[in-house]
């Protein structure tokens, strides 16, 4: 099977027919993926409504079933396979890129006032909402800041909305920042990471419920490889090459 080089990554070419079959299988696996633990109270609520509906109205039953199915879809947590190569910054979330531009990291992280490249990913209600670590390293700081709930696809969401910011120091001493940002519908940011945690690229660290945004600030001097409008797959899509 032929190989060809695409940038700095070697890609194995796949026949079109087989590629389509693989894509279909991957899509089915993603939809049927088990839910994130954060779904538990919502699933219990949906099932409870359906059970109560058995004694009241079939419409209530269907409402409970529909809500339960939606939660199973929204909170799906598919497995991801990070690239085998080290020295890469990976997407911290699924969605599509709404902004690639220099910006100053959140002041609460204490990373200084020098702008660095920021890649902002918008997550619609149809995207997987599990957040993943973009690099190997140590979580040096986590800072939560309350805020508004404006449309997460807008740039001002990075400044005005409720957010939870993490600083991750890589083994070489450089720092990457990831910011979980609540959106117009999302009203709950969950972060399982703790300061001092040693993490691996692609590892799960949290989830944002019902539509949101995730910003990633690259180390100073590192230029992103992605563009606005590009689709991101958390834990798999390469955002930047961190090799000095």
Swiss-Prot record:
Membrane topology term: Peripheral membrane protein
Q: How is the cofactor bound?
A: Binds 1 pyruvoyl group covalently per subunit.
Q: Known InterPro entries for this protein? A: PS_Dcarbxylase, PSD-A
Protein's UniProt keywords contain Disulfide bond: no
Keyword annotations for this protein?
Cell membrane, Decarboxylase, Lipid biosynthesis, Lipid metabolism, Lyase, Membrane, Phospholipid biosynthesis, Phospholipid metabolism, Pyruvate, Zymogen
EC numbers, comma separated: 4.1.1.65
Pyruvic acid (Ser) modifications at: 212
Spell out the molecular function terms from Gene Ontology: phosphatidylserine decarboxylase activity
Q: What is its main location?
A: membrane
Q: What class of enzyme is it?
A: lyase
What about PTM?
A: Is synthesized initially as an inactive proenzyme. Formation of the active enzyme involves a self-maturation process in which the active site pyruvoyl group is generated from an internal serine residue via an autocatalytic post-translational modification. Two non-identical subunits are generated from the proenzyme in this reaction, and the pyruvate is formed at the N-terminus of the alpha chain, which is derived from the carboxyl end of the proenzyme.
Q: Which reaction does it catalyse?
A: a 1,2-diacyl-sn-glycero-3-phospho-L-serine + H(+) = a 1,2-diacyl-sn-glycero-3-phosphoethanolamine + CO2
The record places the site described as Cleavage (non-hydrolytic) at: 211-212
Q: GO annotations under biological process? A: phosphatidylethanolamine biosynthetic process
Where it sits in the cell: the answer is: Cell membrane
Q: Name the coenzymes or cofactors required.
A: pyruvate
Where in the sequence is the active site? 212 (schiff-base intermediate with substrate)
| Signal peptide positions on this chain | none
HAMAP family, A to Z: PS_decarb_PSD_A
Q: Which family does it belong to?
A: Belongs to the phosphatidylserine decarboxylase family. PSD-A subfamily.
Subunit structure as annotated in this protein's UniProt entry: Heterodimer of a large membrane-associated beta subunit and a small pyruvoyl-containing alpha subunit.
Q: What does this protein do?
A: Catalyzes the formation of phosphatidylethanolamine (PtdEtn) from phosphatidylserine (PtdSer).
Name the UniProt record assigns to this protein = Phosphatidylserine decarboxylase proenzyme
Organism this protein belongs to: Granulibacter bethesdensis (strain ATCC BAA-1260 / CGDNIH1)
Tell me the gene name.
psd
């Amino acid at each position: 099977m032929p190989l060809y080089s695409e940038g700095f990554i070697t890609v194995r070419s796949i026949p079109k027919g087989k590629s389509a079959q693989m894509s279909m299988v991957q899509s089915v696996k993603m939809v049927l993926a088990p839910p994130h633990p954060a779904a538990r109270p919502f699933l219990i609520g949906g099932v409870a409504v359906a059970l109560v509906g058995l004694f009241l109205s079939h419409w209530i039953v269907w409402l409970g079933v529909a809500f339960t199915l939606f939660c199973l879809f929204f909170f799906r947590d598919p497995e991801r396979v990070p690239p085998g190569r080290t020295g890469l910054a990976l997407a911290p979330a699924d969605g599509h890129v709404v902004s690639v531009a220099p910006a100053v990291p959140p002041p609460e992280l204490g990373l200084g006032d020098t702008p660095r490249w920021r890649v902002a990913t918008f997550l619609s209600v149809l995207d997987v909402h599990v957040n993943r670590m973009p690099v190997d390293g140590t979580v040096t700081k986590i800072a939560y800041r309350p805020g508004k709930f404006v449309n997460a696809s807008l740039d001002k969401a990075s400044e005005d909305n409720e957010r939870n910011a993490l600083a991750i120091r890589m083994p070489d001493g450089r720092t990457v920042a990831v910011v979980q940002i609540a959106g117009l519908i999302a009203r709950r940011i969950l972060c399982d990471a703790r300061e001092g945690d040693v993490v691996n690229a692609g590892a799960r660290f949290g989830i944002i419920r019902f539509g949101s945004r995730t910003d990633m600030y690259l180390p100073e001097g590192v230029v992103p490889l992605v563009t606005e409008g590009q689709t991101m797959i958390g834990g798999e899509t390469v955002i930047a090459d961190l090799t000095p």
